Amino acid sequence: MHQNAIARVSHEGLAFDKNNNLHYIDELNGGAIYRYNSATPNNGSTYFSGGTNSVLRVGNGNTANATGAFSWVAFTDATGAALPGAVTITDPNGIRSVDGRATTDLAALRGTDYQRPEDLEIQTLANGDQVLYVATTTTNEVYSINLATNQIQTFVSRSTIDAATGLPVGNALTGPDNLAIDADGNIYVVEDQPGGVADIWFATDANRDGVAESLSRWATMSTAGAEPTGLFFDLGNPNVAYVNVQHPTSGVDRLIQITAVPEPGTTGMMLAGLLGVAGLVRRRTK
């Protein structure tokens, strides 16, 4: 069934928080970050029947890629109907929806623009705060959004230290797209690069303050024409991960399993136990 309570944008990443709010993005250079608060958050059958749509705004919303304190600016009412001034759109089937992109470009309802936001992941910290991670492909960044403190920070960027060199990672980090979280709460950043040169990076944020101390190259995919997507850690075995090999030149799409030897005293797939993973991915995807 078509439900139009959520604003019309170029949808990509989605993430639910512990209160069953749905976070979503507009996958565009200049796209914003949104939240949907269902009027019936605990009822699956009516969840998308109506709710409030809001856009993330830092300051007055006029500064792109901004960090710091943010607020949620509502542009629909609790039923999902457009607030005064919001832009609506009617599709060929006569379904009327709120145009999230056009609406949140308006001064009164403006959201902060980010550059091609893609995947979303969410994690709960030890203190109960939830942090939403957003990859922005064009600016080569990942942002962390603390939903309890209403603060957005740059989690990783080209200024983040490369653990292998002790220097800023620079353009070795290109096109962050997918995100994944392992059993220990570590964040992995998957690049979208052409020509089979995409890396998967392991981000170290030891104190969980929302800013990574370093990045380490975890795996590299050399399959011509392909990009890695959908990195996922096995819920039953924290030392097993899966990654898709998408649109290779050969035309043979694959799902690759990566198995690692865990470090003593850990349950997650830590870097020292992953020496040779890049080669494993290369061999299995050729």
Report residues per predicted region:
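A short, hydrophobic C-terminal helix/tail in secreted or cell-surface proteins
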Residues: 263-281
